Regions:
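Conserved alpha/beta-hydrolase
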Residues: 88-110
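N-terminal cap/lid segment of alpha/beta-hydrolase-fold proteins
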Residues: 32-58
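Catalytic nucleophile-loop/oxyanion-hole region of alpha/beta-hydrolase
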Residues: 74-77, 105-133, 137
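Alpha/beta-hydrolase-fold enzymes
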Residues: 149-238
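Conserved alpha/beta-hydrolase "acid-adjacent" motif
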Residues: 272-278
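The serine-hydrolase catalytic nucleophile loop
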Residues: 73-85
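Catalytic active-site module of serine/aspartate enzymes centered on a nucleophile-bearing elbow/loop
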Residues: 299-327
């Protein structure tokens, strides 16, 4: 069955049509990424949603596999540069497209940065972007690659697909947060949910929620230090966005039980948010008939694409992608 016939029925299909801006003059991308805009023109009027994305594609080569990158919390499409450049060098028939996630620091609507009204908007954006990539490369296999928060979005979007109608051919989850740490008191999680119901648009900083807690993200950088160097960093987020992330984390193990495509899970042994046992518990819930691969890097941290072990990690990703290419 053609992939275009296998899309799951998000409202996005009825509401959005995909247009490319005049930036498509840069369509044939070489070894350097180009920022191109996607226009989600909504039927029935209203301002269209426009988001940027970056492409790593070997010039003159038609890919037989395309990776779609969904970046993490306070991240950006450029976070995929290290992986994209690795693939350009070692897998010329693999292209990587990474888009700017709604409500994050590169959202063109400034008032929307640090906020999300409904997580279905994230899923709709991913599905619409996937359709754009499929229209451009109709014969290529599609792999979703979510990092951290992006892993939450990709997993839940896939979970919403009807059985037998998966919108991608495989899933890479890099540093997914699959459960809350045991040292996080349940009442704190419940308090955020209640506060988000009462004051959904109130904004708070992460420092206000977790004072004096600066998480190590790579061997060389902690969260505060790393975020301050990013032009796309957001200082404060709405309570409803934080509550949404809490619900997505809480639902990850349920999503695992409904997994319907091959999955690769990447985890750093020094990741602050989850440990090896958490990952193994998540993977154990994936149905027996689904191909699942788990890679644990004992000395790595949360941001694996920036980690000192990234070349080893990228080689493992490349081996897994080649298996999907042969499926």
């Amino acid at each position: 069955m053609p992939r275009s016939m296998r899309h799951f029925p998000y409202v996005a299909f009825r509401k959005f049509r995909l247009l490319l801006t005049l930036a498509l003059a840069a369509f044939a991308t070489g070894c350097a990424p180009d920022a191109i805009l996607v226009n989600h023109a909504k039927d029935g009027g209203g301002e269209p949603d426009t988001f940027g994305y970056r492409t790593w594609k070997r010039k003159g080569v038609e890919p037989d596999l395309v990776v779609i990158g969904i970046h993490g919390f306070c991240g950006a499409a450029m976070d995929y540069a290290n992986l994209g450049n690795h693939l350009l060098q070692h897998q010329p028939k693999t292209a990587l497209y990474a888009y700017e996630v709604r409500g994050q620091g590169s959202d063109p609507i400034h008032a929307r940065r640090g906020d999300i009204g409904d997580p279905n908007q994230w899923y709709d954006d991913l599905e619409a972007f996937t359709q754009l990539v499929e229209e451009r490369h109709p014969d290529a296999k599609i792999i979703w690659y979510g990092e951290s928060m992006g892993a939450l979005i990709a997993t839940h979007a896939l979970h919403a697909a009807p059985a037998g109608q998966a919108p991608c051919d495989g899933l890479v989850l890099s540093s997914p947060i699959v459960r809350f740490k045991n040292d996080i008191e349940p009442w704190k999680i419940a308090l955020v949910q209640v506060a988000a119901t009462t004051l959904p648009l109130a904004r708070v900083s992460l420092d206000a929620i977790a004072p004096e807690q600066d998480v190590q993200m790579t061997q060389e950088a902690k969260h505060h230090q790393q975020s301050q160097t990013n032009s796309y960093n957001i200082e404060k987020h709405t309570l409803r966005l934080l509550a949404t992330l809490g619900r997505l984390i809480d639902g990850m193990n349920n999503c695992a039980a409904g997994m319907q495509v091959p999955v690769l899970v990447l985890h750093g042994g020094k990741d602050y948010f989850n440990d090896d046992a958490d990952m193994r518990g998540f993977i154990a819930r994936i149905p027996p008939g689904i191909s699942k691969t788990y890679k644990n890097y004992p000395d790595a941290y949360h941001l694996l694409m920036y980690d000192e072990e990234r070349e080893r990690i990228f080689r493992d990703i490349g081996h897994w992608l080649n298996k999907r290419r042969r499926d």
